[in-house]
Amino acid sequence: MAFKIPESVLVVVHTADLDVLLLERAVQPGFWQSVTGSREPDDADLAATALRELKEETGLAVGTLTDWCLTNRYEIWPQWRARYATGVTHNVEHVFGFLVDRQTVATLDPAEHIAQLWLPWQEAMRKTFSPTNRDAISQLPGRVLERGSTA
């Protein structure tokens, strides 16, 4: 088994009206999150990782991807550490935004996610279980204004 690379992406899928798509994890019902996933060896760069994960987890391919130039480092939960090389305890997460024209029904991979919700950014921020995901969503209004709705 190849070990996972301890580098990942978090992609906040949103509309210009600041509605955010959240996905409910299949292995942890009740845990809601944005699109996430690990970099793979054949990904050309982190943007490629983000686009691959978007396609795999939601089927979404039409939108504007923006690198937020935001990086988080967090401890990998003990129950997931066997997926990584011995001694790896932390992951580096790179945050992206993905602007879509309207709320779109995602095509979920049932092995990964069992439900989806579009919520106003404040509600999405409260619903997500991950502190880094909450922080990213909290920055959405400023990023949309700063970049003219292309966050």
Positions of predicted regions on the chain:
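The catalytic Nudix box helix
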Residues: 34-71
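A conserved beta-turn-beta hairpin within the catalytic core of GNAT-like acetyltransferases
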Residues: 27-31
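Short, charged, intrinsically disordered terminal tails
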Residues: 148-149
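Short connector loops at helix/strand junctions that flank enzyme active sites
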Residues: 6, 34, 89-93
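Conserved N-terminal beta-strand and adjoining loop/helix that marks the start
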Residues: 1-20, 42
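NUDIX/MutT-family hydrolases
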Residues: 95-99, 106-138
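Active-site-adjacent beta-strand/loop module that shapes the phosphate/pyrophosphate-binding cleft
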Residues: 72-105, 117
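Short, acidic/hydrophobic/Gly-rich beta-strand patch recurrent on exposed beta strands
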Residues: 22-25
